From Swiss-Prot:
GO terms for biological process: chromosome segregation; heterochromatin formation; mRNA transport; nuclear pore complex assembly; nucleocytoplasmic transport; protein import into nucleus; protein localization to nuclear inner membrane; RNA export from nucleus. One of its GO terms (molecular function) is chromatin binding. This is Nucleoporin NUP170. The gene is NUP170. It is a peripheral membrane protein. Residues 233-261 are annotated as: Leucine-zipper. Its main location: nucleus. It comes from Saccharomyces cerevisiae (strain ATCC 204508 / S288c).
Length: 1502
């Protein structure tokens, strides 16, 4: 099923060398005669004046231009001591700091990316000047570089050949590689011959008429039973029959079923049948149907209107499709008239009806191409029910385009030879631009690009041309070069300056090449770009063509009649030509070269078809043709060539086979493909166990030492090295090929000067040896490296096929998996993504690599240093850069060796998983996999399906943890089957130790103790205690490897036997063992820094603490049950015992000396709304916790002041309350005022004498805050009822006011002034002790003006009284609050203002005496103070003071009524007779003068 990694699939071809007399094609850069190595070396000697003894000791075999150019440019000494280092270098940072597996993984990632982004195979720029062929006319003449070798020959049985030769009408033959059968038609009989068994063949002879065409197609989906994978279509002269084919691949037994489906095709003469695999649609064309394309319809149902099988013409109307196909051609004279309008440039002198000769389909783009008998190509887009088009390409168009290119005037593309014999589509994966390749009768390949719209082809254009190789001799090449040099010299003269430059010699000779003349329709192109040409030549024709090509190009060509030559007998020669792009040269040097030669064949070729899958490396043009990337994982390409008597199997020669043939001199391989590829192949050959010891030894010698004196393989320090990864996407050009080659030859990559004290391992260019090792590992695993390890039930895109391209990663659809489906299956994972056979294949290959590294790993990783010392015979001081380079090399190679070991363990794990999934009696069904995965939690399964093979092979801690879950599942399953944990775990550790360490073994033993404890329950306390103690002790030993999931599982088993207090103690011990250095506490103390490495210890502790809290929740729930628990695993206990169990559990937690745990436990209680429990806790940590958390938690602050008050610490309680009232917490203003009130109450409580002064200061601050809060509350009330404010603004103001207590400045500037709350402003003046008289009086004026604006003067007394009441209320309210401040409430100034305000605003008759003075008295001003203020106003008034007199009169009368003492000193008569106050009749003044005392009256002036 799989190609063996370290075994050759066929015999190696004998080593061959090239003859120096053979002709060599020319490169595009240097036109020199190619007469072999000796001449090149001598010419180089003349130019350089340097000896060539080194090159002569290593003769170069082959005619590859790169090898010859390299030889020519070499000088004495070693050829590039650092050959290809620069080209292969990948700079990976962290060489000295990365973990080995991480470092190796980075290199594999980069190399995979590089392999997947190599150049596109066919670009126009590659061969504008002709194709650079490495060509030999001799059969298998390229020696080691011959692309194909004959592997086997299957002769057609004699009885079939005899019957074939006695056919009466028509015979045909072909190959069905899908069935491993050869088909042969003889008249009306079809024979299916088993290629692998000469005596096994089947005959289908149900047809009555001669068979015209046979085809094998895939059926439409859901039409036949699943066993039917193919349909056999047999077209006769009358009908087209359909047979169902079933093939048992295990036994190779073929079954043919007659479906009884057929359709009449009389008059069509079917010539070709093709199918569109995506839709299953079948198309065909016929010689008698002109240019029409038909479609065959079939179904599994038959009704009144539609038959099961029918045909429809897709290229003409329904009416015309009803007429006989050849009716038009039967009309006399039609052919002659048609011929008048046709191009007769082919010179055949006649005319014929144009018909289709071939159909082909571009399966990806959905285009069907037809080739006509007149070499016209037509393209149609396959739509749902029809064909859109056509887009036509005619020979005239091709000739016109050729005339505008360098291919103009090419004899091989003249009218006589511009006949297309075969067309092949180019898949978009191979080339996005190219659509089609057409082969001409002269062996020219015409490449067409195109563009598509949504439902049509927008354009098909001739893009490039590949001419066949030329067979000219070196003498002719030399003659042409001399001629071009003469022409070049002429151009230096003015007269010749306008002459056009001559075309390249290579192109000039290829344009008239006759090597592939008479190419037949059996020729083909096999992706990617492999050209097979079946050629028919006569011996006379071959001789004449060679003579013509080798004739002088400078003079006139020789005419056929110049000499009379004796005619030789004419014999036909059947040749098989193959030309394969050398992709190794293209990706290494950016130069396009094709290896071309003739292969041995026994007779006329009937068909050429690939038997195995192609070696496409990606699904995109970049990297598609990279055969080096897939050489270890893809099946070797085999091509079947069907002749008239046999089937010849040709096998593509892989790089390792080329290297084996060149083992005595691998220099050509190095020059072509680079030293890294050579080292990779050498390592591969070294590991082949079926090769000779000498061959493997030579390969190992090259891997370790290179070619001494010619190719040194060692690392180099270069500070300015640039990684090739950054330029992967740049397109190599021919202009860069020579430059890169010269750099390789002359040793361009030299150590850069560096500071001796400053060396970076990242600047080392590692040796090709390392890259060879890395490439082999990368390519071996390329198909699975980025692929998911496991599949889900919903992922149907993955099959169990061994290899799937890494460019199309598999992504499990976890989110699409329905919950009911998960619950039904109890699993997300369905299976491993690769089969057991595939795992064993990889494992066997990795084991061989691992054994190689065990034997040679130490010497290879340290080979550079000994090599330097061994070659340091001249006493040279070893440069520090060499030491650094060797150190980096050793690190990198050791990383790869460790990666191989890790891959081995990862694959071993998967192998164990398959083995454990085996169920006896059900081989290869792995029914136990579902049971194993069922032990894994769904959360872990979700992580497992995201796991790539890359993660498995270079596992981090998380990956190892996930794999351990599966290993634990295997152990659990074995436990259920009665197996021993010890035995199973030990076996797992031996096979995949990195996933099953010694700690895991201890963990498994602990789980075993817990399992037994659970089984015992509470029936036997001593045994139970024994197992639980042992389990906890074992788990505490492996605390560093104990995952939180395992810890949960262990605790769950402990709690099932009521092991609550000890479980809590165990968990807290685990938490402290995880963090023995108390790093978590340091992390907290330093403020939870974001990039602090100690955070991981903190996180671990928190996870364990959460388990403690979960345990406490469970014990709380247990205690709250009223009735005893009677579950199977728990003993019945009374409710009192449950309460005691909870009490002991909490005691175990609270007595544990762990500050961090206590803090988190208190946080947990608060989060559970059980903060009141904190008031009852007496631990050393509770008060510090409350004090620390109070500043950031409102709940904790409330708890703290209650905590203090319960312990009679009233000052501390008041202080906390004051802080709360002034804090930034989200507290309403009312609550803040309440806090202040409580705080004030605590200040008035009994407290120690030492706190008296502090309490007084605190009480003062509280009082100030209360006053401000009161004003803020007044503003809030006004805002609530203020209709002037917009609702949105009002909400914002309310939100601001109903929160934090603001400052007086904020209240004044942001609220009182903008909202014109004048009375509030006066209140703020008072509490702020503001004394600016002018500002204060201005605010009073604003207040009076605002009141005046509210008065509606209608002249009615009622309105006047309302206004008086309004004014009175405002002044009384203000006065009561500020009257004790003479600055804010200056009565001497306010009284006249109020009087003027009254009398200016209201009618005098509405003003009652005493209305004004009563306002001040009600506001709290005393009578005697008011008396002296009025008296002074009267005495100092310059104007009419009648208003003051009236108010004084009312004041004295009211004083008399209200004050008993006043009545005692003033006589009633004085009051009765006081009608109008004057200074002269003032009773108070009279009393003072008479008595000489003031009777204790406090005078205002004082």
């Amino acid at each position: 099923m799989f190609q063996s990694f370290f075994h050759n699939n066929g015999p190696a071809a004998a080593g061959e060398t090239f003859s120096d007399s053979r002709s060599y094609p020319l490169t595009n850069h240097q036109e020199v005669p190619r007469n072999g190595l000796n001449e090149l070396a001598s010419s180089a000697t003349k130019a350089q004046q340097q000896p060539t003894h080194i090159l002569n000791s290593y003769p170069i075999t082959g005619s590859n231009p790169l090898m010859r150019a390299s030889a020519m440019g070499a000088t004495s000494g070693s050829i590039n001591p650092n050959m290809s280092n620069m080209n292969e270098h990948i700079r990976v940072s962290g060489m000295g700091t990365s973990k080995p597996l991480d470092l190796a993984g980075k290199y594999i990632d980069h190399l995979q990316h590089k392999d997947s982004n190599t150049p596109v195979l066919d670009e126009r720029s590659y061969y504008n000047s002709g194709v650079d062929y490495n060509f030999s006319r001799e059969k298998n003449g390229l020696g080691a570089f011959t692309p194909f070798e004959k592997q086997d020959v299957f002769n057609i049985p004699d009885e079939i050949l005899h019957e074939f030769s006695t056919s009466q009408t028509k015979t045909d033959m072909g190959i069905f590689p899908e069935l491993n059968r050869c088909w042969i038609t003889i008249d009306n009989k079809l024979i299916l011959w088993n290629i692998n068994n000469d005596n096994e063949y089947q005959v289908v002879d149900d047809m009555k008429h001669t068979i015209q065409k046979v085809a094998l197609v895939r059926p439409k989906p859901n039409t036949f039973v699943p066993a039917v994978k193919h349909l056999l279509l047999i077209s006769t002269t009358m009908e087209l029959f359909m047979f169902a084919i079933s093939l048992d691949k295990a036994t190779n037994e073929l079954s043919v079923f007659n479906t009884h489906l057929s359709v009449p095709v009389q008059g069509i003469d079917v010539i070709d049948i093709v199918s569109h695999e995506r839709s299953g649609r079948i198309f065909f064309a016929g010689q008698a149907s002109g240019l029409n394309i038909w479609e065959l319809h079939y179904s599994g149902s038959d009704d009144w209107f539609n038959s099961k099988c029918s045909k429809v013409c897709l290229t003409k109307s329904a009416l015309l499709s009803l007429l006989p196909t050849n009716m038009l051609s039967q009309i006399p004279g039609v052919d002659f008239i048609q011929a008048l309008f046709e191009d007769n440039s082919n010179g055949n002198g006649g005319f014929s009806q144009e018909t289709i000769t071939q159909l082909t389909i571009d399966q990806q783009r959905g285009i069907i191409y037809s080739l006509s008998s007149k070499s016209t190509i037509r393209a149609y887009v396959i739509t749902e029910k029809s064909l859109e088009g056509p887009m036509s390409i005619e020979p005239a168009y091709i000739s016109r385009i050729i005339g505008t290119t360098t291919a103009r005037a090419a004899p091989i593309l003249g009218p006589k030879y511009l006949k297309i014999v075969k067309i092949s589509s180019v898949a978009p994966e191979e080339n996005n631009n190219l659509f089609l390749v057409a082969l001409t009768v002269g062996g020219v390949r015409l490449y067409f690009n195109g563009s598509m719209g949504r439902f049509n082809i927008e354009a098909l254009r001739l893009e490039s041309i590949k001419f066949p190789p030329s067979s000219v001799t070196p003498e002719v090449i030399q003659q042409e070069l001399l001629h071009q040099q003469q022409e070049q010299a002429k151009r230096s003269f003015p007269f010749f300056s306008n002459l056009m430059s001559s075309e390249p010699v290579l192109l000039k000779f290829q344009k008239k090449s006759s090597v592939l003349l008479e190419t037949t329709k059996a020729s083909t192109i096999i992706s990617p770009g492999i050209f097979f040409s079946a050629v028919i030549k006569s011996s006379q024709q071959t001789h004449q063509q060679e003579k013509k090509e080798n004739s002088s190009v400078t003079g006139t060509t020789a005419t056929a009649g110049s000499k009379t030559v004796k005619q030789q007998p004419v014999t036909l020669q059947h040749k098989l030509f193959v030309s394969v792009p050398d992709y190794g040269i293209l990706k290494t040097h950016g130069k396009y070269v094709e290896n071309a030669t003739f292969l041995e064949t026994a007779g006329p070729v009937q068909q050429i078809i690939p038997l195995s899958g192609l070696f496409n490396a990606t699904t995109k043009p970049q990297g598609f043709a990279n055969e080096f990337a897939t050489q270890y994982t893809s099946e070797t390409l085999r091509v079947a060539v069907l002749t008239s008597t046999s089937i010849e199997i040709y096998k593509y020669r892989t790089p390792d086979e080329i290297f084996e043939d060149l083992i005595d001199n691998p220099l050509p391989f190095v020059l072509n493909y680079g030293a890294a590829e050579a080292c990779s192949t050498a390592l591969f050959v070294t590991c082949k166990s079926n090769k000779s010891e000498k061959l493997r030894s030579n390969a190992l010698t090259f891997l370790t030492m290179g070619i001494p004196g010619v190719v040194d393989i060692k690392p180099v320090y270069n500070r300015y090295s640039v990684s090739t990864v950054s330029s992967l996407l740049s397109k190599p050009t021919l202009s860069t090929a020579t430059t890169n080659l010269q750099q390789s030859i002359t040793g361009f990559s030299k150590p850069s000067p560096a500071n001796k004290e400053d060396f970076d391992l990242d600047d080392v260019i590692l040796s090709p040896r390392f890259y060879g090792i890395a490439l082999l590992i990368t390519r071996l695993l390329r198909d699975i490296w980025g692929r998911h390890v496991f599949m889900t039930f919903t992922d149907n895109r993955v099959t169990s096929h061994a290899f799937i391209s890494s460019s199309d990663p598999i992504t499990p659809s976890i989110n699409n998996l329905k919950s009911d489906e998960i619950s039904q299956n109890r699993n997300i994972i369905s299976k491993v993504s690769i089969s057991k056979d595939c795992i064993e294949y990889y494992l066997s290959s990795i084991n061989i690599l691992n054994e190689f590294f065990i034997t040679y790993g130490d010497s290879i990783s340290q080979i550079s240093a000994p090599y330097v010392l061994a070659n340091n015979s001249n006493g040279r001081v070893i440069d520090k850069t060499e030491e650094v380079a060797n150190q980096a090399e050793s690190i990198a190679i050791n990383a790869m060796i460790k990666m191989v070991q890790s891959i081995k363990e990862g694959l071993s794990f998967l192998n164990v998983l398959y083995e454990e999934s085996e169920v006896e009696g059900f081989d290869n069904q792995y029914l136990g996999f579902k049971d194993i995965i069922s032990f894994v939690s769904l959360d872990v399964q979700k992580d497992l399906v995201k796991l790539d093979f890359k993660d498995l092979f270079a596992p981090n801690d998380k990956t190892k943890s996930l794999i351990r879950e599966i290993l634990l599942s295997i152990i659990n399953r074995n436990i259920t089957k009665g197996a021993s944990i010890e035995y199973t775990a030990t076996a797992l550790q031996e096979r995949c130790g990195s996933f099953c360490s010694a700690s895991d073994i201890l963990g498994f033993r602990a789980i075993e103790h817990l399992r037994r404890a659970k089984e015992i329950g509470l029936r036997n306390y001593d045994s139970l205690n024994y197992h639980l103690k042992n389990a906890t002790a074992l788990l505490e030993q492996i605390v560093d490897d104990l995952s939180i999931e395992k810890l949960k599982e262990a605790v769950s088993m402990m709690l099932s036997v009521n092991y609550y207090p000890k479980s809590i103690e165990f968990l807290l011990n685990i938490a402290n063992s995880m963090d023995k250095g108390k790093l978590a506490c340091q992390y907290v103390a330093n403020g939870f820094l974001e990039n602090d490495d100690r955070k991981q210890y903190y996180d671990k502790r928190i996870l364990v603490y959460d388990l403690v809290f979960d345990t406490l929740i469970k014990v709380d729930e247990l205690a709250e049950k009223k009735q005893s628990s009677k579950t199977q695993n728990q003993i019945s206990i009374s409710n009192d015992d449950e309460v005691k169990l909870r009490q002991k559990s909490y005691e175990a937690a609270l007595k544990y000396n762990d500050r961090l745990f206590h803090y988190h436990m208190y946080d947990w209680l608060v989060s559970q709304n059980r903060e009141e429990k904190l008031l009852d806790i007496e631990t050393p940590f509770i008060l510090p916790y409350l004090m620390e958390k109070a500043g950031s938690s409102l709940k904790i602050s409330n708890i703290l002041w209650v905590y203090y008050s319960r312990r009679s610490k009233f000052f501390e309680s008041a202080e906390i309350l004051y802080r709360l009232a002034t804090s930034n917490f989200d507290i309403t203003l009312f609550e803040r005022i309440e806090f202040l009130s409580r705080a004030n109450g605590f200040c008035n409580s009994v407290s120690p004498l030492s706190q008296k002064q502090r309490i007084v200061q605190l009480a003062s601050r509280i009082q100030d805050a209360c006053e401000v809060a009161g004003i803020q509350g007044d503003i809030l009330s006004l805002v609530y009822t203020d209709a002037r404010i917009d609702s949105a603004i009002k909400d914002e103001l309310i939100k601001t006011l109903d929160g934090k207590i603001l400052s007086t400045s904020e209240l004044f500037n942001d609220f009182a002034v903008p909202l014109s709350y004048h009375e509030i402003a006066l209140f703020i003046f008072k509490i702020a002790d503001f004394r600016d008289h002018e500002v204060i009086m201005a605010k009073w004026d604003e207040l009076f003006q605002s009141l005046r604006m509210e008065f509606n003067n209608t002249g009615k007394k009622e309105d006047s009284m309302n206004f008086i009441n309004l004014l009175s209320n405002v002044l009384i309210k203000i006065g009561k609050n500020v009257q004790d401040s003479e600055f804010i409430f200056p009565i001497f100034e306010l009284f006249p203002i109020v009087c003027n305000f009254f009398y200016e605003t209201l009618p005098k008759e509405h003003i009652v005496s005493g209305s004004i003075v009563s306002i001040f008295i009600t506001a709290g001003v005393s009578f005697n103070k008011m008396y002296y203020i009025l008296k002074e106003l009267i005495e100092t008034s310059d104007s009419d003071n009648s208003v003051f007199n009236k108010e004084m009169t009312w004041l004295i009368h009211e004083w008399y009524k209200s004050d008993r003492k006043f009545r005692d000193i003033i006589s009633y008569n004085d009051i009765i007779h006081l009608k109008e106050y004057k200074i002269d009749n003032d009773p108070i003044e009279k009393y003072v003068k008479n008595s000489g005392n003031n009777l204790g009256i406090c005078f205002y002036k004082e």
